[in-house]
């Protein structure tokens, strides 16, 4: 994989001003983004998140998943910590793309869970890859990570790439009546590390 750094700009947000670093995968044409906040100290573990694109959750406020809640909470946590990063990867629908994700949602509306829907469409439960993150982290100067995730695959992928994951920080937010079954499937079938105690319930109406 060939990751090319393109440019950096300021990104004002409700939680403060982040820096937005653009990257291009010259093999696939996909465009990825790294957000950084504060002055990153490479000698210290940096709070961060690896976030896969979710148009429906991140931009359209969908309650079918917890993605948008996780992204906003991660940005808020980073701002409160004074430094941190988010890698925003263009891997919509756990890697199957937006239109296939809508097809999967259609199957879920008919009773399939998130894993069954992917498999009925001929995909694995999770098609994402993470090899692009190492050159992105190298560019922004991150060597050690306190990773905000519930997904053990992300921790494993980072360690296999030689990135030191010093701590896993649970990020369990956004549970509501529309995504309860989805979150249960992520826990029981995809191995996401979740506990009922940590859930923050929102938008119950």
From Swiss-Prot:
<dbReference type="GO" id="GO:0008270">
    <property type="term" value="F:zinc ion binding"/>
</dbReference>
<feature type="active site" description="Proton acceptor">
    <location>
        <position position="126"/>
    </location>
</feature>
<feature type="binding site">
    <location>
        <position position="70"/>
    </location>
    <ligand>
        <name>GTP</name>
    </ligand>
</feature>
<feature type="binding site">
    <location>
        <position position="65"/>
    </location>
    <ligand>
        <name>Zn(2+)</name>
    </ligand>
</feature>
<comment type="similarity">
    <text>Belongs to the GTP cyclohydrolase II family.</text>
</comment>
<dbReference type="InterPro" id="IPR000926">
    <property type="entry name" value="RibA"/>
</dbReference>
<feature type="binding site">
    <location>
        <position position="114"/>
    </location>
    <ligand>
        <name>GTP</name>
    </ligand>
</feature>
<keyword id="KW-0378">Hydrolase</keyword>
<dbReference type="GO" id="GO:0005525">
    <property type="term" value="F:GTP binding"/>
</dbReference>
<feature type="binding site">
    <location>
        <position position="154"/>
    </location>
    <ligand>
        <name>GTP</name>
    </ligand>
</feature>
<feature type="active site" description="Nucleophile">
    <location>
        <position position="128"/>
    </location>
</feature>
<feature type="binding site">
    <location>
        <position position="149"/>
    </location>
    <ligand>
        <name>GTP</name>
    </ligand>
</feature>
<protein>
    <recommendedName>
        <fullName>GTP cyclohydrolase-2</fullName>
        <ecNumber>3.5.4.25</ecNumber>
    </recommendedName>
</protein>
<keyword id="KW-0686">Riboflavin biosynthesis</keyword>
<keyword id="KW-0862">Zinc</keyword>
<dbReference type="GO" id="GO:0009231">
    <property type="term" value="P:riboflavin biosynthetic process"/>
</dbReference>
<dbReference type="InterPro" id="IPR032677">
    <property type="entry name" value="GTP_cyclohydro_II"/>
</dbReference>
<comment type="pathway">
    <text>Cofactor biosynthesis; riboflavin biosynthesis; 5-amino-6-(D-ribitylamino)uracil from GTP: step 1/4.</text>
</comment>
<feature type="binding site">
    <location>
        <position position="67"/>
    </location>
    <ligand>
        <name>Zn(2+)</name>
    </ligand>
</feature>
<keyword id="KW-0342">GTP-binding</keyword>
<dbReference type="GO" id="GO:0005829">
    <property type="term" value="C:cytosol"/>
</dbReference>
<comment type="function">
    <text>Catalyzes the conversion of GTP to 2,5-diamino-6-ribosylamino-4(3H)-pyrimidinone 5'-phosphate (DARP), formate and pyrophosphate.</text>
</comment>
<feature type="binding site">
    <location>
        <begin position="49"/>
        <end position="53"/>
    </location>
    <ligand>
        <name>GTP</name>
    </ligand>
</feature>
<keyword id="KW-0479">Metal-binding</keyword>
<keyword id="KW-0547">Nucleotide-binding</keyword>
<dbReference type="GO" id="GO:0003935">
    <property type="term" value="F:GTP cyclohydrolase II activity"/>
</dbReference>
<feature type="binding site">
    <location>
        <begin position="92"/>
        <end position="94"/>
    </location>
    <ligand>
        <name>GTP</name>
    </ligand>
</feature>
<dbReference type="Pfam" id="PF00925">
    <property type="entry name" value="GTP_cyclohydro2"/>
</dbReference>
<dbReference type="InterPro" id="IPR036144">
    <property type="entry name" value="RibA-like_sf"/>
</dbReference>
<feature type="binding site">
    <location>
        <position position="54"/>
    </location>
    <ligand>
        <name>Zn(2+)</name>
    </ligand>
</feature>
């Amino acid at each position: 994989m060939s990751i090319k750094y393109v440019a950096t700009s300021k990104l004002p947000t409700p939680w403060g001003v982040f820096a937005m670093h653009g990257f291009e995968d010259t093999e696939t044409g996909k465009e990825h983004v790294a957000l950084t906040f504060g002055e990153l100290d490479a000698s210290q573990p940096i709070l961060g998140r690896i976030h896969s694109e979710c148009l429906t959750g991140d931009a359209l406020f969908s309650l079918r998943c917890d993605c948008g809640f996780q992204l906003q909470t991660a940005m808020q946590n980073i701002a409160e910590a004074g430094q941190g990063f988010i890698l925003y990867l263009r891997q919509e629908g756990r890697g199957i793309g937006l239109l296939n994700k809508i097809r999967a949602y259609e199957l879920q509306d008919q009773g399939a869970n998130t894993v069954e829907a992917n498999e009925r469409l001929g995909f694995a439960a999770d098609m994402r890859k993470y090899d692009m993150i190492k050159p992105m982290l190298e560019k922004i100067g991150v060597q050690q990570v306190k990773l905000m995730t519930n997904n053990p695959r992300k921790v494993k992928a980072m360690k296999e790439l030689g990135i030191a994951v010093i701590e896993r920080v649970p990020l369990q937010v956004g549970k509501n009546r529309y995504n309860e079954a989805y979150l249960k499937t992520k826990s029981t079938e995809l191995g996401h590390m979740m506990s009922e105690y940590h859930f923050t319930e929102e938008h119950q109406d």
